[in-house]
Swiss-Prot record:
<dbReference type="GO" id="GO:0042101">
    <property type="term" value="C:T cell receptor complex"/>
</dbReference>
<dbReference type="Pfam" id="PF07686">
    <property type="entry name" value="V-set"/>
</dbReference>
<dbReference type="InterPro" id="IPR036179">
    <property type="entry name" value="Ig-like_dom_sf"/>
</dbReference>
<keyword id="KW-1003">Cell membrane</keyword>
<keyword id="KW-0472">Membrane</keyword>
<dbReference type="GO" id="GO:0009897">
    <property type="term" value="C:external side of plasma membrane"/>
</dbReference>
<comment type="function">
    <text>Probable non-functional open reading frame (ORF) of V region of the variable domain of T cell receptor (TR) gamma chain. Non-functional ORF generally cannot participate in the synthesis of a productive T cell receptor (TR) chain due to altered V-(D)-J or switch recombination and/or splicing site (at mRNA level) and/or conserved amino acid change (protein level).</text>
</comment>
<dbReference type="InterPro" id="IPR013783">
    <property type="entry name" value="Ig-like_fold"/>
</dbReference>
<dbReference type="InterPro" id="IPR013106">
    <property type="entry name" value="Ig_V-set"/>
</dbReference>
<feature type="signal peptide">
    <location>
        <begin position="1"/>
        <end position="19"/>
    </location>
</feature>
<feature type="domain" description="Ig-like">
    <location>
        <begin position="24"/>
        <end position="119"/>
    </location>
</feature>
<keyword id="KW-0732">Signal</keyword>
<keyword id="KW-1279">T cell receptor</keyword>
<keyword id="KW-1015">Disulfide bond</keyword>
<protein>
    <recommendedName>
        <fullName>Probable non-functional T cell receptor gamma variable 10</fullName>
    </recommendedName>
</protein>
<comment type="subunit">
    <text>Gamma-delta TR is a heterodimer composed of a gamma and delta chain; disulfide-linked. The gamma-delta TR is associated with the transmembrane signaling CD3 coreceptor proteins following the stoichiometry: a single gamma-delta TR heterodimer associates with one CD3D-CD3E heterodimer, one CD3G-CD3E heterodimer and one CD247 homodimer forming a stable octameric structure. Upon activation, gamma-delta TR complex associates with FCER1G to initiate intracellular signaling.</text>
</comment>
<dbReference type="InterPro" id="IPR007110">
    <property type="entry name" value="Ig-like_dom"/>
</dbReference>
Amino acid sequence: MSLLEAFAFSSWALGLGLSKVEQFQLSISTEVKKSIDIPCKISSTRFETDVIHWYRQKPNQALEHLIYIVSTKSAARRSMGKTSNKVEARKNSQTLTSILTIKSVEKEDMAVYYCAAWD
């Protein structure tokens, strides 16, 4: 199997500047059909109530909202009209991170992935 240069990352924080969002890996490569985790560190005094949103932008396309997660105890919610289980998001209050998982990566998944946080 050939490697797939899958992702480049950036991040931004919205709201009142209460959350600092960081994605440390600039790119991740994986093999086709493998799953991949994309971490996002959220430095916030209100991590438990921050809403974490995940977006992607494919080359020459508009930014697309994928999924968001409100609580470490609840399931993530997909954008309206999206029913695919290809992506999952979760929050970890011990490490103050959100993880976006992309299942069974295909060449079409190559994009820039962003996380954003606000309360």
